[in-house]
């Protein structure tokens, strides 16, 4: 190779090395600058805040009314990028709000934020006078009003408590979570977490900044309360907020512990469903240790198990009529307190009494005899057909309580007590409502339904939870005959306090004895439907530690019916 050729190769080699070096330096600069831009972009995003307490869809009634009672409240919002003397101005803001300045400084380091507490008129006036740049009073959507409805059903939110739950949330859906996020812990908030959780704010405020995080002159503060989040949905229930409100007002005035369920007659749709004692969902934001609160606060009494007492006699009456074992004028004997194996509540006894009178007067000895005639197998068959072994509620996947076992009716020495709704017989208020609905609906059993579907922001249902087809569990003729007998309960029997002028009612009382209650106290039931002809509402009232179904629950049934008819 000639010397001149070697020289050219050497020059070419070093030019190539130099070029590669320049490329590497440029790539490093790009990477470094990219990091800076990424950081600035992050800062840019940090100049926006969500003007909603929780980025979640709503849980609504059948008409789209929020059950949580959400509302807008003024909150102090701070945009640090607009503060021209951040240290002094944050200290001045802390003095006005009577809060910790260091805490405000720490929040400001993270970007824009709002202070989630009520704003007094005097404080608002001071803020207006101070005219701090970057400090604004903005309406923030609060999820819970002063009187949220159906809290045991809607459930509550809580922060992700553990890495285990965080991993589960991340792996079971398409939504992204951070440790410390607020998520559904119970009820519909829990069951529909993935559908309710939003991915972006529907209501927000922000300051436009460029890629380097500098304020863009001109637009100033921007507020949008109509943004669209396509990934958050609303849970649409079958609840009627008007009926639910009536039920809860009556309960708050009269029921310390118990449940009320209202169903649209001839369907399985639940119009109202409430339990007491109750709570306000914001308690979980205010109490540091939830374990210190009584467990009973959070039990959904409407889906909990209780002995039904004489309400269970409806099952025996339906079975006996359907099987042709009795007619309305079949006679029974009642010896009162001397009757065995189960005494009658009427100490002197009903003596010789017809089946019609026995149901109207809720005669225990008559139904014990009827239970023995039917036998455990047939009682179990009809109780199951009428829904007393099904805890399913469409759209509300509560776990099954395995203590409910109708087979126990066939156990030794159980048949007599079971015939009057004691012993091993356990039911939920929702099941009792569905039982009475099967009579009101001409012998058709409808599965209870609480959720009708999921809707988007426009109110359009994007997913439906259809009602199940009804099942004919007794003949229409039997349902008509039994309905007439239940009407008689409110005309001449122990349920007369459920009757109201001008509207005929059908129903049944129940008084279940519970170990541990004071003398004379029982779980008091009244379950019925109204009007007797062409029913519209089926209602169950349970008052724990009441005086008796006819004395305690029946008058509350009447009050709820009266008020429901007024708002139609």
In which residue ranges do the predicted regions lie?
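Intrinsically disordered, low-complexity acidic/polar segments
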Residues: 85, 162-163, 536, 548-550
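Beta-lactam-recognizing serine transpeptidase/beta-lactamase-like catalytic domain environment
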Residues: 68, 215, 222-223, 264-310, ...
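Short beta-strand scaffold segments in enzyme catalytic cores
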Residues: 259-262
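Alpha-helix boundary/capping residues
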Residues: 96-97, 111, 130-131, 199, ...
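Conserved NTP-handling cores and scaffolds of large molecular machines
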Residues: 31, 97, 157, 443, ...
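Extracytoplasmic/periplasmic proteins that interact with beta-lactams or build/remodel peptidoglycan
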Residues: 1-257, 279-282
């Amino acid at each position: 190779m000639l010397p001149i050729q070697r020289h050219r190769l050497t020059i070419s080699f070093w030019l190539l090395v130099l070029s590669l070096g320049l490329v590497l330096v440029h790539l490093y600069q790009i990477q470094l600058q990219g990091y800076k831009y990424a950081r600035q972009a992050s800062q840019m995003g940090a100049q926006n805040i969500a003007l909603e307490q929780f980025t979640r869809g709503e849980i609504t009634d059948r008409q789209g009314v929020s059950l949580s009672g959400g509302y807008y409240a003024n909150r102090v919002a701070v945009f640090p990028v607009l503060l021209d003397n951040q240290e002094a101005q944050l200290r001045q803001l802390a003095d006005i709000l009577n809060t910790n300045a260091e805490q405000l400084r720490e929040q400001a380091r993270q970007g824009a934020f709002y202070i989630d507490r009520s704003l007094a008129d005097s404080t608002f006036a001071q803020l207006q006078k101070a005219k701090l740049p970057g400090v604004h009073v903005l309406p923030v959507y609060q999820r819970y009003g002063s009187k949220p409805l159906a809290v045991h059903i809607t459930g509550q939110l809580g922060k992700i408590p553990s890495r285990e739950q965080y991993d589960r949330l991340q792996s079971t859906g398409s939504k992204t979570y951070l440790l410390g996020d607020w998520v559904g812990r119970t009820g519909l908030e829990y069951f529909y977490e993935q559908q309710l959780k939003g991915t972006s704010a529907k209501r927000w405020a922000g300051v436009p900044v460029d890629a380097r995080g500098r304020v863009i002159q001109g637009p100033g503060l921007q507020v949008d309360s109509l943004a669209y989040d396509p990934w958050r949905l609303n849970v649409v229930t079958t609840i009627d907020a008007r009926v639910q409100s009536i039920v809860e007002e009556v309960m708050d005035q009269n029921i310390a512990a118990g449940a009320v369920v209202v169903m649209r007659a001839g369907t399985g749709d639940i119009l109202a469903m409430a339990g007491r004692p109750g709570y306000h969902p914001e308690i979980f934001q205010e109490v540091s240790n939830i374990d210190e609160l009584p467990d009973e606060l959070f039990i959904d009494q409407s889906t909990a198990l209780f002995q039904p007492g004489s309400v269970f006699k409806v099952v025996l009456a339906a079975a006996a009529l359907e099987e042709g074992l009795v007619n309305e004028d079949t006679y029974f004997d009642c010896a009162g307190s001397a009757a065995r194996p189960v005494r009658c509540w009427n100490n002197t006894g009903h003596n010789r009494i017809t089946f019609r009178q026995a149901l109207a007067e809720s005669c225990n000895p008559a139904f014990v005899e009827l239970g023995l005639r039917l036998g455990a197998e047939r009682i179990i068959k009809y109780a199951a057909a009428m829904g007393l072994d099904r805890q399913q509620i469409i759209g509300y996947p509560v776990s099954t309580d395995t203590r409910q076992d109708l087979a126990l009716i066939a156990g030794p020495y159980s048949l007599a007590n079971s015939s009057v709704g004691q012993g091993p017989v356990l039911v939920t208020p929702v099941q009792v409502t569905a039982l009475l609905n099967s009579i009101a609906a001409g012998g058709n059993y409808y599965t209870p339904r609480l959720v009708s579907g999921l809707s988007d922001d426009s109110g359009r249902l994007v997913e439906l939870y259809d009602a199940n087809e009804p099942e004919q569990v007794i003949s229409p003729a039997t349902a008509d005959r039994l309905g007439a007998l239940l009407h008689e309960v409110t005309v001449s029997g122990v349920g007369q306090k459920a009757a109201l002028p001008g509207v005929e009612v059908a129903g049944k009382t129940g008084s279940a004895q519970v170990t541990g209650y004071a003398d004379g106290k029982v779980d008091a039931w009244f379950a019925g439907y109204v009007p007797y002809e062409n029913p519209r509402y089926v209602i169950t009232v349970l008052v724990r530690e009441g005086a008796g179904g006819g004395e305690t629950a029946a008058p509350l049934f009447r009050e709820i019916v009266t008020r429901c008819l007024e708002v139609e």
